[in-house]
Amino acid sequence: WTGAISGRGHGRFWVATGFVVIAHRFGYALEHGAANMPALLAHQCDNPLCQNPSPAHLRPATSASNSAEWASRRHTIGSPLRDLRGSLGRASALRDAARDGIELEPVAMAGLGVLDANQAPLWTESE
């Protein structure tokens, strides 16, 4: 997403004066139908700018399940949830890099603390 960003780092746009649409919810409705729109969508990728409507990225959730998942993943080394810039700072940096044609991975990594940047994983998915 390279447009406006909410205080929580989600893409957004205005469709009328005073009427804001959260971009990932709009994309999800386009992909899955407005009738199938859940009250809450969870970002499995922990990237609030993500616009990918596939279940690997966005899925229906409850407030309780979304909060529990956030709490369990915020301590994962290298997680976007650990970015020292906060969700808005991280989203703004990534959006600006995308607008400027800059590689996104170094920009994403720049917000991680020393522990996150230097910690090797204990195991990989293939093990």
Pin down the residues of each PLM region.
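Long, compositionally biased stretches
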Residues: 1-19, 48
